[in-house]
């Protein structure tokens, strides 16, 4: 059986190796995490240290006067219902949902509100910067020789915040709930494809009996990017309809509990769980953690940060540079490179008109000036993306230059026009492109605000489309509205991010399988929102699902699958990106820095729980 793993560095082959990289080399690469707009922070960019005499990437040692922030800035009074010196305040996106914490239904839970990081916990955490796999709710896992059973052991000390023990029965209930309800967000998927039965011989043991071998099923239970499998308390959820239950207040196992949500302040207040089960390993100093929407004006948000009314976020790189130049000494900027390039997602459903033709996807690619976007849209230069995954050192093994060179993602309006003519989308007397007797039109949607990078990327493409005779526009929607349109296929192109590959390309190809394609207007429940139907890619993907991706048997299949992907371009890579984290050291110290990147620094990732656990009060009142 799977025993406690203790301190372990991720030699689990395909998780860490495909996430990790030489850290400093990666910082130079200019990557970024795509869910920043949806899960936290405005559309930020990689940042430079600048020449200002203030905050740096490693922090400063000079201390301001007791009632001043860095650079002599006065400390403001944060509008919060808790003692400031006992509270960490995190600036976040515009919150909309305050009365529901059910992530399995549309608009059932607000992304980036702290629930995923402070209240929920996961079976395992992958610390990307260090490479350590951290067992948490589970203590270990083990496969049998032919990968047809997967055994998890759970920590006998784990308890829900209502005092009930977490057991293997909770895990079994949670897995089967999703397996047997594919309409739920996160439903179906690998659980439906692979898990035939679950045995629970004792409260700490769950044995997954698989319908076919799968050496990578444990990936689903590791918090590697943002979040992971959410174990639900059976004693609560078995009495509820999962399609309607709001789960408010949420019962989970984390070190914090929901104290209150304050809609008119767009604020969530979390308080320490006095009976937290894992205090021996994690006993955070802050009594409260608040996630709050920042001001819509970046100038106002920056001033709030300068007055130490926020400890995390509430800043973009433009204003961070300004604070440095002013000598603001309490700013720490920590760059972090994550797995999601910026990308354009074209809809494949014929109901959406010209965009459904795969040739139009190549037109869009030819009209995407990646060099310009990488140099001017992101505040620091970031490289173009050729593959639909991050250019980590560990991902180089998945690159196939012989295939990529056939489909070079280049900026060429001339090739775009020639391809449009070849498609029959010729210009009328007014210079407008026609498609099947009607004017060709394309709308780009994005969850980014109008000054966000994803919006600007969409705008650059719209500008080029107009030049070649296609009426086009770009629209910004709030996260919840965009999410609904995205899942229902009610878009032509979505400008956002591509986070579908965290371990190997087989994950991306599985995501696009035809069985997940729904009619426009139906919820895609988290997969194949672009409605791709590609039988050849389906066949290759299903073969790859059962293979070690680094095996000799998988190599030719990966090559064919990449070629098939490029032919259809169901997601169009744009640039690699970087999201720096901004911290204020007025009230709290111990933040991750470039020189001490002890864990993932992004506040919307599950691993941020460990950052909160490292903080110490400065003594500022």
Residue ranges and their predicted role:
Residues 155, 244-247, 275-323, 362, ...:
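Ligand-site clamp/hinge motif
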Residues 1-25, 35-42:
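N-terminal secretory signal peptides
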Residues 188-237, 366:
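Surface-exposed binding/hinge segments that line
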Residues 72, 384-429, 448-456, 553:
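Structural transition elements
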Residues 89-145, 176, 251-253:
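N-terminal lobe/hinge region of extracytoplasmic solute-binding protein
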Residues 109, 114-117, 127-132, 224-283, ...:
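Gly/Pro-rich hinge or "lid" segments in bacterial periplasmic/extracellular proteins
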Residues 81, 148, 362, 374, ...:
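Extracytoplasmic/peripheral linker and loop segments enriched in polar/acidic and small residues
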